[in-house]
C-alpha cells in the first residue's frame, strides 16, 4: 500500500486529531488568499513605482521610452513583469539615475556599457542606454513611438516594429519570453513592414529567423518581407 501524502505541520496539530481532507482544503484556501493578497500588493507597488519613476523623469525633461515586458504587453500578449525598463539616451543615463535618486530611489551604476538600476519598494527600474546588438534610443525610434494607457498612466513606448526588432535580437535560450512577446506582436499589430525591414538591419539574421518561424506558425508575415531580409543577410 502506498504511503499517504505528507501533511503540513499545521494540519497535523489541529487539536491533536488526525487531519481530514477538509483541513487540507482549508489550508489551501488560506494559502490561495495569502498569495492573492501578495499579488495584489505587488501589483499596487509596481503601478505606484512606475508612476513615480515616469513622472519624475518627465518633469526633469528627459526623453525616454518604456521598454520590456510592460511595453510589449500593451501591443501584444498580456504578461506580468516584475520590473520597469526605461530606454534613455546614453548621454542622459547618469542624469536620469540622479533624478530617480532625488525622487527617493536607491540607485547603482550597474554596468557603464548599457544599464543602470534604481530600486523602490522592491520594484526594480532598469535604466537602459544600449540594447544588445548596438540599438540606442534615436530620433527615428522616438518619432515612431506610440502612447498607450496603463492603469490610468499614459506611457510612451517603442513602435510595434521596433519592439519586434529588439525582442528578436535580445532573445536567448534563457529568455525565451522575448521571442514569444515578438510573436504576439507580429500576430496582433498592424505593421509597417518597410520600416521593420529598415530597423532590422542592425540584427537582420536574428530577425529573419524570427519571421520565418512566425510564418511557419501561420502568423501572417508577407513572403516578400522574408525575401528582402534574406537578401540582406545572404545577398541576392
Describe each PLM feature range:
Residues 2-236:
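Compositionally biased terminal segments of proteins
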Amino acid at each position: 500500500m502506498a504511503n499517504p501524502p505528507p501533511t503540513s505541520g499545521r494540519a497535523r496539530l489541529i487539536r491533536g486529531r488526525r487531519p481530514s481532507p477538509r483541513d487540507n482544503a482549508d489550508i489551501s484556501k488560506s494559502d490561495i488568499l495569502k498569495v492573492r493578497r501578495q499579488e495584489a500588493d505587488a501589483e499596487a507597488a509596481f503601478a505606484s513605482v512606475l508612476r513615480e519613476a515616469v513622472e519624475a523623469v518627465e518633469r526633469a525633461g528627459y526623453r525616454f521610452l518604456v521598454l520590456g515586458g510592460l511595453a510589449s504587453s500593451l501591443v501584444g500578449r498580456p504578461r506580468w513583469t516584475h520590473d520597469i525598463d526605461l530606454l534613455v539616451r546614453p548621454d542622459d543615463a547618469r542624469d536620469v539615475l540622479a533624478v530617480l535618486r532625488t525622487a527617493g530611489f536607491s540607485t547603482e551604476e550597474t554596468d557603464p556599457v548599457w544599464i543602470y538600476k534604481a530600486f523602490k519598494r522592491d520594484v526594480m527600474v532598469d535604466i537602459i542606454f544600449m540594447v544588445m546588438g548596438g540599438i540606442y534610443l534615436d530620433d527615428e525610434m522616438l518619432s515612431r513611438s506610440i502612447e498607450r494607457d496603463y492603469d490610468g498612466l499614459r506611457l510612451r513606448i517603442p513602435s510595434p516594429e521596433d519592439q519586434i526588432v529588439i525582442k528578436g535580437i535580445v532573445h536567448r535560450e534563457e529568455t525565451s519570453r522575448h521571442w514569444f512577446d515578438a510573436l504576439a506582436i507580429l500576430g496582433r499589430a498592424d505593421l509597417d513592414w518597410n520600416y521593420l525591414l529598415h530597423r532590422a538591419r542592425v540584427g537582420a539574421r536574428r530577425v529573419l529567423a524570427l519571421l520565418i518561424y512566425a510564418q511557419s506558425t501561420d502568423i501572417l508575415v508577407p513572403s516578400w518581407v522574408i525575401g528582402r531580409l534574406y537578401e540582406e543577410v545572404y545577398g541576392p
